[in-house]
């Protein structure tokens, strides 16, 4: 029989009763076991994520089946390479106790434990987003969270923002479509969303977008189906994912990329780094490159899912960033959020720790349990050959820029072409669902805001605006 101990291995003789002065007397301060239990309970929770708070996770692997050596030198993308990973799904707006089956964007964040360090691809289940400049991000998230006075979600705030920021129309159309409430995490696609870069052995740059197509098929819920499910099970997505993996019904996704040569970037006809737009598949076709599978559940949700920490700043040789303003901001904001939420040394936790060799001069900090390896010197530059040194062969190619530093308003104000193309792809039933979902989300919204929004939908398609108006009258 295992002996019960406290956090420091001290054997506990009585775990049922507090130490008191007499049977009916007050408690004694020397009851260190009671104090330890209470103090630990007070600190069991860390700050929840300000976005993507409610989530589920699983381990798996990615296998590359295509030859991408012409585009990238990243070892993870060598043909036949198998790389372990951890994937965290999430909703965006809701708190940690929110229901899984709400109408919301889903997070799709992957940590690849590559031979060259961790690569984090922090995406969503949509290829676009509501905004293209991170300067608006805090304000946008405020519209999705609770009103500070009423502590209620506000349709008025959401539609006020969307109608004043028409670049959001593409993502709003996706969110309000039949795909706005996936039936489960297994039955939705994933996207890197941002534009990233590939760099090959010749130090040539290519622009790339990542896609993950579910092999379980797309399944969605209507508003009514979601409401009925939430009434029965607020953890429906978590339950579905966990049970599927436990039953060895491992979910899979086909991995695809869109690749565009640096010299061809102007041929798109719009800013290729605009997160509110997609790259048309007719111009930049999808390329199948492999398969991703999830095959292992976490053993401890808090340790492995709640403390999982992702950041787009984690990249490996052969993969780089782009001038996408949203991506640029996330490079800072994500690791900053993790340091606040988990601590300075969050990277040392098992779920976040690289499986490759780590050689750094970063030392100490709260909760640092790593052994220091640089015996020759603890600073850099230094004179000792056996200490870690920089390697200039990993420098990225130059990125040609032009213009002066100022706060630039986007030059591309075509907010309607891509939402129109998406709307025209929908069948009659999908359009009807779209109209009713938008009308339902406009409940309680000021008339002037609805009027402003309808003018934008009219510019996408007269049928779009007409359908919403009709649904609003019911």
Swiss-Prot record:
GO terms for cellular component: cytoplasm. Its EC number is 1.11.1.6. CDD domains: catalase_clade_3. Keywords: Heme, Hydrogen peroxide, Iron, Metal-binding, Oxidoreductase, Peroxidase. The keyword Heme applies. InterPro entries: Catalase (IPR018028), Catalase_3 (IPR040333), Catalase_clade1/3 (IPR024711), Catalase_core (IPR011614), Catalase_haem_BS (IPR002226), Catalase_immune_responsive (IPR010582), Catalase_sf (IPR020835). GO terms for biological process: hydrogen peroxide catabolic process; response to hydrogen peroxide. SMART domains: Catalase. Its cofactor is heme. Heme binds at residue 334. The active site is at residues 52, 124. It catalyses: 2 H2O2 = O2 + 2 H2O. The keyword Nucleus does not apply. One of its GO terms (molecular function) is catalase activity. Belongs to the catalase family. Decomposes hydrogen peroxide into water and oxygen; serves to protect cells from the toxic effects of hydrogen peroxide. This is Catalase. It comes from Campylobacter jejuni subsp. jejuni serotype O:2 (strain ATCC 700819 / NCTC 11168). The gene is katA.
């Amino acid at each position: 029989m295992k002996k019960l101990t406290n956090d420091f291995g001290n054997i506990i003789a009585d775990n049922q009763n507090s130490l008191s002065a007499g049977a009916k007397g007050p408690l004694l301060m020397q009851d260190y076991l009671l104090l330890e239990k209470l103090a630990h309970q007070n600190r069991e929770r860390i700050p929840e994520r300000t976005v993507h708070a409610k989530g589920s996770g699983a381990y798996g692997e990615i296998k590359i089946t295509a030859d991408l050596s012409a585009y990238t030198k990243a070892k993870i993308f060598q043909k036949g390479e198998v790389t372990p990973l951890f994937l965290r799904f999430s909703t965006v707006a809701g708190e940690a106790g929110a229901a899984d089956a709400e109408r919301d964007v889903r997070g799709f964040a992957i940590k690849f434990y590559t031979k060259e360090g961790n690569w984090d691809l922090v995406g969503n289940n949509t290829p676009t987003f509501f905004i293209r400049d991170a300067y608006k991000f805090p304000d946008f998230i405020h519209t999705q969270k609770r009103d500070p006075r009423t502590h209620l979600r506000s349709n008025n705030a959401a539609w006020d923002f969307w109608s004043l920021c028409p670049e959001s129309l593409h993502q709003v159309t996706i969110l309000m479509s039949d795909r706005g409430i996936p039936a489960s995490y297994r039955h939705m696609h994933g996207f890197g969303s941002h534009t990233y870069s590939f760099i090959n052995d010749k130090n040539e740059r290519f622009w790339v977008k990542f896609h993950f197509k579910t092999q379980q098929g797309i399944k969605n819920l209507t508003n009514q189906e979601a409401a009925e499910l939430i009434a029965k099970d607020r953890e429906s997505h978590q339950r579905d994912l966990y049970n599927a993996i436990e039953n060895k019904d491992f979910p899979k996704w086909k991995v695809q990329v869109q690749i565009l040569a640096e010299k061809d970037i102007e041929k798109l006809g719009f800013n290729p780094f605009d997160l509110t737009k997609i790259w048309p598949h007719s111009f930049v076709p999808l390329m199948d490159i492999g398969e991703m599978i999830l095959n292992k559940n976490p053993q401890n949700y808090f340790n492995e899912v709640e403390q999982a920490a992702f950041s787009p700043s984690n990249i490996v040789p052969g993969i780089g960033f782009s001038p996408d303003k949203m991506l640029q901001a996330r490079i800072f904001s994500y690791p900053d959020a993790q340091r606040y939420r988990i601590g300075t040394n969050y990277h040392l936790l098992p779920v976040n720790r690289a499986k490759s060799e780590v050689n750094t001069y970063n030392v100490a900090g709260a909760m640092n349990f790593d052994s220091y390896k640089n015996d020759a010197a603890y600073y850099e530059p230094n004179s000792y050959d056996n200490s870690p040194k920089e390697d200039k062969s990993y420098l990225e190619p130059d990125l040609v820029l032009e213009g002066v530093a100022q706060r630039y308003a986007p030059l591309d104000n075509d907010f309607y072409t891509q939402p129109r193309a998406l709307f025209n792809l929908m069948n009659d039933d999908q359009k009807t669902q779209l109209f009713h979902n938008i009308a339902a989300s406009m409940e309680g919204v000021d008339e002037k805001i609805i009027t402003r929004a309808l003018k934008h939908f009219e510019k996408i398609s007269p049928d779009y605006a007409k359908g919403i108006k009709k649904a609003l009258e019911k």
